[in-house]
Amino acid sequence: MSSKKGSKTSKTSRSVKQTEEYYDDDAEFQNSEDEYPPSDEDLDNSGGSDDENTQSGGLSDAPDDELGEDSATLDIDPDDEAEYDTDGDEKFNPIDEMGEPEDPDDPSEQEEDEVEDLGSEDVDNVEIEDDAADIEDLDPELVDEARNSKSKQCYMKNLNKDFIALDEDDSGIYSKIEYKKIPDNERETDPILTYYEIVRILGTRAQQFNYGAKPLIKGVEGMHPAKMAFVELTAKMTSFIVRRHLPGKKYEDWRIDELGMIHTITEELFVPDNFNWDSITALHKTMISNQQKNSTTDTETLSTQENASTRVSGSNLRSRSGSKSSKSNNSRSASKSNSRTESKSNSRTGSKSNSRTGSKSNSRTGSKSKKSSNTKSKSKRNSDNSDDSDYSDYSE
């Protein structure tokens, strides 16, 4: 409501200023006419027609202070007539008033009017209602619900994750995939060297020649390393394998002699002067034939070695099985002979030992019994002799 009251005061001050400015403008206009009266030349040029004077609002018989009824509001701008109020009664203007009109029956507006009517000294004595008591009377659960309703809700909590494909961190999946080589009979790319592959092969091979590598073709000694690499490549004698990577971490391996060349290189850095290409091609053909022969001989030797190894392994297996069977038979016969000899020896040794031990024990026990009987008889005799001697002593 303070804004509404402020708008009222601003309206009144604005109207007063406008009236003051109006009167000041009129006075300045009159003073300007008095200070700068029109000259005779201006009047002659104007023609002195009554129509122009009446249209311009000038030249009347009445003095400046006593204007007629028709020209009483002649100097007022029509746009300012709505703001200029001669009666002093202010009316509501929807353009100037941005807010809603005041409601005299609203109790809150009446209270604000009363507070504004009070003096500056009575402002401190005005009792302001504390809303803390009203807040304490509220149910805390309702307050929490109101706060939660205003906050942003997470809609992912209520979704069923079993039927939703959530975006996971799959940045390391491609790195975990292992490279897979495509077999030679399933290669898909064209057997032609690309321009990039040619340049890469020439640069790498020239660098190897700079480091002291020996060329694989004759007749190029003393040339520039780039020319040596070019001649070796045209002869398809470069011992490189071109690896072509494909999507899905797959790759193909191509030998240089398997790839053709459709791109021509005419730079002087690579192409030697007055070089016999026919000899190189012939040498290349002979080298290829030799390689094929060597490969066939190698395969034959490998096959023969494999067959020999299989034969040797078969004989070894047979000999091992024979030795195992002989060993088992020997062990069986040995066990049988051992069992027989043990039984015989046990029976013989048992009878002998029993007879010997029996005779020895009997003889020993017999001799011992004889000795004991002799000792007993001797002791009896001694006792008899002692008795006789005693009696003899007494008899004496």
UniProtKB/Swiss-Prot annotation:
Q: List the disulfide bonds.
A: none
Q: Which reaction does it catalyse?
A: RNA(n) + a ribonucleoside 5'-triphosphate = RNA(n+1) + diphosphate
Q: Where is the composition biased (Polar residues)?
A: 290-312
UniProt lists compositionally biased (Basic residues) regions at: 367-380
What keywords were assigned to this record? DNA-directed RNA polymerase, Nucleotidyltransferase, Transcription, Transferase
Enzyme Commission number(s) from the entry: 2.7.7.6
Composition-biased stretches (Acidic residues): 21-53, 76-88, 97-137, 385-396
Q: Which cellular component appears as one GO term in the record?
A: DNA-directed RNA polymerase complex
Class of the enzyme per the UniProt entry, highest EC level: transferase
Q: Biological process (GO) annotations? A: transcription by RNA polymerase I; transcription by RNA polymerase II; tRNA transcription by RNA polymerase III
Sequence segments annotated as region (Disordered): 1-137, 290-396
Q: Which domain of life is it from?
A: Viruses
Q: Where is the composition biased (Low complexity)?
A: 313-338, 346-366
Give a short account of what the protein does.
Answer: DNA-dependent RNA polymerase catalyzes the transcription of DNA into RNA using the four ribonucleoside triphosphates as substrates.
Q: What is this protein identified as?
A: DNA-directed RNA polymerase subunit 6
* Species the sequence originates in: Acanthamoeba polyphaga mimivirus (APMV)
